[in-house]
Amino acid sequence: GLGDVYKRQFVRGIPVDNLYEDQDTEEVYNRLLYAASRQLFALVVGDAGTGKTTALRRLKSVLDGQDYTVLYLSESKLTPRHFYNGLLEQLGCETRFYRGDARNLLHHEIEIMRGVGHRKLVVIVDEGHLLSKEMLEEIRFLLNYKMDSENPLALILAGQTELWEKLRLQAYRAILHRVDIQCFLMPYEYAQTKAYIEKQLTYAGHPNAIFSEDAMKAVHSFSSGIPRPVSYTHL
């Protein structure tokens, strides 16, 4: 039945090739791709459910097949030591107890990766709005380590709107000034919500219209144009 259709497709885990795309999502994706290729610091901001993690999934899936190593961290209580050791673990390295030792080892591994493996590092940190000032300062400190006059890595920091509000405060101004690219994910207009639903249904094997225009408008109104609630709305 119709409920089964929703349960089957409006869930996480849809292959990246089948994700909904439009001009806005494409612009965010291209900005992130540019940040990765140029080893820049990018900020991705949007309310819960607006597609931050989806955008990051798409980026990672594309970069993984190229000359990049992509590392992903998402932890609300992230400390500088856990940050470095989390990255080292993903690189297959032994962790270090002291922050400075872990940082130095990471820099060493990055130099090998770039010089010998000819690979660029992309670090994605999700849930950035939950990070402490100490952790955000550590990110800036990491980026200040220069190799060949380039950044040692691309860093993509994603979080809810509170992250942007925090970075605009005077106490965080030095971090904000370090940001190279800003991406803001906004709720969908009605036409985008409709296209999003149709894309999901096509992936589910239902290319024909099964929702009325009024039903789609009701979904858009209920969800306020935010993709995640659309995905879990049962009509």
Regions found by a protein language model. Give the residues of each.
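Pre-Walker A adenine-sensing motif
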Residues: 25-35
